[in-house]
């Protein structure tokens, strides 16, 4: 430990440069991870936050909610097997509504399910859906579109007017805010091919016969654009981590080669290989931890100045995960240098410098 920290102190510029590179790389990893998670949440938070672990969709829907059409008989089949409280059918469609007395239009995803079920949205402002057929509860992000509680929006199919009575939170679908309506009104606002249920949300682990049951992850992966967005950003993150490991490895390898004579002297006076190897690992750990701490501070600062509509979400578990990954790749990056330290011969190293 003493040797590692003393060397860091003596060679501030050398280690400062690699530290700066590590800060930039870890900062990029955190930013892209935040964007990936934010896009994921912006695309599918309504499904992610459902208190359901499985879904029943139509066999021919390719696991896509917007394609799925489930008949009432199929719903009864599932409900009879698991119970009414554990199986809740719901409908989904996307549409463009227009604000009353305004030319302002807003894209929305319309959800409809039974009242007082586990799919009912939690209200953060205003009131929950009542029995009236002209009310809607919307995700609070709709305020960015100029729609607030008390405003009226018009359905393009039925020309029916709906008043926003409450806001919920974290309810997005396909990058559009979700609005909730009563089941009774669905028939008037849907096209002829949209009358059936889209899916059945299950809050049970029972085996269900004569039904196409999939888990939540499969539903998320089938939302338009979800898999493609996440795949692209995950690949970028993976490349950044590989680049970080290579840079750390090359840096410490070059440093170790430059210190061959000093390492030989240390070995000649009785310093053990384990002590020298430990010093190298401590340096890598110190730099990676400092780099991650600085990166986290920078990312949190960036998060404060990002526009409200920017899909950015970085949770504490995610940060902890990347801190652990970065520490691991820092240690892996020193492996080739550790081998170089172990194979240094004291006599050859000292003699080579004479």
Task: State what each model feature region is.
Residues 1-29, 353-354:
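N-terminal Sec/SRP start-transfer signal
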Residues 8, 265-274, 353:
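Short helix-to-coil transition segments within interhelical loops
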Residues 14, 27-53:
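Alpha-helical transmembrane segments
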Residues 91, 104-114, 121-184:
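Hydrophobic secondary-structure segments that place a key small or acidic residue at a functional site
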Residues 158-160, 167-240:
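Mechanotransmission and gating elements of multispan inner-membrane complexes involved in transport
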Residues 278-279, 285-331, 335-352:
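Short helix-loop junctions at transmembrane helix boundaries
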């Amino acid at each position: 430990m003493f040797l590692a920290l003393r060397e860091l102190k003596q060679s501030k510029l050398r280690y400062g440069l690699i530290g700066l590179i590590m800060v930039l790389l870890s900062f990029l990893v955190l930013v892209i991870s935040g964007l990936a998670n934010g896009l994921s949440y912006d695309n599918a938070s309504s499904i992610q936050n459902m208190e359901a672990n499985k879904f029943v969709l139509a066999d021919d829907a390719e696991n896509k909610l917007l394609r799925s059409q489930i008949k009432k008989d199929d719903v009864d089949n599932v409900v009879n097997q698991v119970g009414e409280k554990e199986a809740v059918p719901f409908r989904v469609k996307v549409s463009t509504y227009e604000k009353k007395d305004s030319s302002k239009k807003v894209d929305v995803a319309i959800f409809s399910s039974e009242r007082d079920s586990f799919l009912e949205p939690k209200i953060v402002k205003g009131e929950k859906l009542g029995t009236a057929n002209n009310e809607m509860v919307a995700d609070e992000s709709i305020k960015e579109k100029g729609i607030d509680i008390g405003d009226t929006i018009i359905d393009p199919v039925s020309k029916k007017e709906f008043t926003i009575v409450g806001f919920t939170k974290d309810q997005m679908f396909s990058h559009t805010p979700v609005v909730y309506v009563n089941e009774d009104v669905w028939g008037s606002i849907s096209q002829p091919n949209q009358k059936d249920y889209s899916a059945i949300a299950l809050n049970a682990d029972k085996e269900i016969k004569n039904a196409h049951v999939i888990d939540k992850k499969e539903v998320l992966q089938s939302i338009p654009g979800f898999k493609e967005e996440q795949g692209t950003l995950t690949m970028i993150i993976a490349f950044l981590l590989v680049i970080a490991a290579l840079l750390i490895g090359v840096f410490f390898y070059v440093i170790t080669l430059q210190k061959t004579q000093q390492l030989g002297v240390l070995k000649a006076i009785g310093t053990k290989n384990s002590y020298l190897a430990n010093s190298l690992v401590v340096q890598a750990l110190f730099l990676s931890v400092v780099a991650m701490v600085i990166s986290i501070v920078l990312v949190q600062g960036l998060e404060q100045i990002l526009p409200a509509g920017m899909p950015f979400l970085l949770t504490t578990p995610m940060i902890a995960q990347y801190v652990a990954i970065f520490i691991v790749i820092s240690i892996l990056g020193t492996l080739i240098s550790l081998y170089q330290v172990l194979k240094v011969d004291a006599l050859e190293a000292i003699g080579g410098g004479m």
